[in-house]
UniProtKB/Swiss-Prot annotation:
Residues 108-369 form the Protein kinase domain. Residues 48-60 have a biased composition (Acidic residues). Activated when autophosphorylated at Thr-154 and inactivated when phosphorylated at Ser-261 by SnRK1.1/KIN10. The lineage of its organism: Eukaryota, Viridiplantae, Streptophyta, Embryophyta, Tracheophyta. Transmembrane segments: none annotated. InterPro entries: Kinase-like_dom_sf, Prot_kinase_dom, Protein_kinase_ATP_BS, Ser/Thr_kinase_AS. This is Serine/threonine-protein kinase GRIK1.
């Protein structure tokens, strides 16, 4: 999944708004322990819910997480996954060293650590089977089981849900899960992910820290394509932000980190509490009211675009509460002289009213997005191809 120093935030780290970027408490990328989350001890909700209301929220969110897990288990048990090849599941772990003294797990040879977070670490390994590199997220099950992310939920639940979600998905703009290694005799748990060894197609036009329109358009097209696929499969990412977008050597963007994602049975994507990164949080999420997960993801796309174009956050306060207040109440400021089509797109994505906010379908067809490449077409995914093949067979 991970590439060395190729998160958007690191590319733009020369600009102050990214140098002090706040991490979601779940996010292992860019690998530092989190410093600014919903559980920071500050008031996280301008609506000011009382303790009874917070308890009700907790029960509701726990129920939502359990429903996500039940939906995912049902999909996996019945083969309802959008993957041509299933994720490999390995229940036997063998540790050792190669002839050069490098540590090994099964057929993977350790090369170097490429990151760490509050849950575990990410290490670059090379496979002796295909000689390819893989990014392996390593966890200790005992640590995850003790680590509370909510009064009734542990980090182990987050990781297992992330694994189940990634087992059901396959898309060129989404990081691919290759294998899960979970030996009951060991405390270790491994997620083997594709390694994105990319170089930035960085265009230094525009303000310091920004990417410029050409690169931003290219990247945003990939983000929208991947997110449209997720939403079509009833998956809400929940934490779209530059840190979770990785770029390949060919300039393709891949969405990663599904640790706070949720799955729905149908179009009912209503959520109550946002576990994502505060500065990317939609206004309705700040108010402690029920909101649409899809619409909140779309707002986060808007914040990401704003960052890519202008090199700063649209709303940022000195404290968590101040940030939420600005997201809810402050007007959106866009500098004069910006491309009118780009301005229109940013305003549509960052519309505070979720009912008036631009949809991803509208974004895919927006003039600034289409440019010379045309509208973003719907991806013909594995489950869609399979359904079409079955339909053709029934007609033949």
């Amino acid at each position: 999944m991970f590439c060395d120093s190729f998160a958007f935030a690191q590319v733009m780290s020369c600009f102050g708004c990214f140098g002090g970027s706040e991490r979601s408490r779940h996010s292992p990328n860019p690998y530092d322990d989190d410093t600014y989350s919903h559980d920071s001890g500050e008031t996280s909700n301008p609506g000011g819910d009382d303790e009874e209301g917070e308890e009700e929220e907790e029960v509701e969110e726990l129920s939502r997480s359990k429903r996500s897990e039940e939906i995912l288990k049902c999909k996996l048990q019945n083969g309802l996954v959008c993957r041509q090849f299933p994720v490999k599941e390995t229940n036997k772990l063998t540790r050792g060293e190669d002839e050069d003294g490098n540590k090994t797990i099964n057929e993977f040879v350790r090369e170097r650590k490429i990151g760490s977070g509050s849950y575990g670490k990410v290490v670059l390994y090379r496979s002796t089977v295909d000689d390819k590199h893989y990014a392996i997220k390593a966890f200790h099950k005992s640590h995850l089981s003790r680590l509370r992310v909510a009064p009734s939920e542990t980090a182990m639940g987050d990781v297992l849900r992330e694994v189940m979600i990634m087992k059901t998905l396959e898309h060129p703009n989404i990081v691919n899960l290759i294998e899960v290694i979970d030996d009951p005799e060991f405390d270790d748990f491994y997620m083997v992910l594709e390694y994105v060894d990319g170089k930035w197609a960085y265009d230094d036009s525009g303000p310091p820290g920004a990417l410029g329109e050409i690169t931003a358009r290219k990247y945003l097209r990939d983000v929208v394509a991947g997110l449209m696929y997720l939403h079509a499969h009833n998956v809400i990412h929940g934490d779209i932000k530059p840190d979770n977008l990785l770029v390949t050597s060919t300039g393709r963007v891949k969405i990663g980190d599904f640790s706070v994602s949720q799955v729905f049975k149908d179009d009912d994507d209503q959520l109550r509490r946002s576990p994502g990164t505060p500065v990317f949080t939609a206004p309705e999420c700040c108010l402690g009211i029920t909101y649409s997960g899809r619409s909140a993801d779309t707002w986060a796309v808007g914040v990401t675009l704003y960052c890519m174009i202008l090199g700063q956050y649209p709303f940022l306060g000195d404290t968590l509460q101040d940030t939420y207040d600005k997201i809810v109440h402050n007007p959106l400021i866009i500098p004069e002289g910006l491309n009118p089509r780009l301005r229109d797109l940013i305003e549509g994505l960052l519309c505070k009213d979720p009912n008036q906010r631009m949809t991803l379908k509208a974004v895919a067809e927006h003039p600034w997005i289409t440019g010379e490449d045309g509208a973003i077409s719907e991806y013909c995914c594995w489950c869609k191809r399979k359904a079409e093949e079955e339909e053709d067979q029934n007609h033949s």
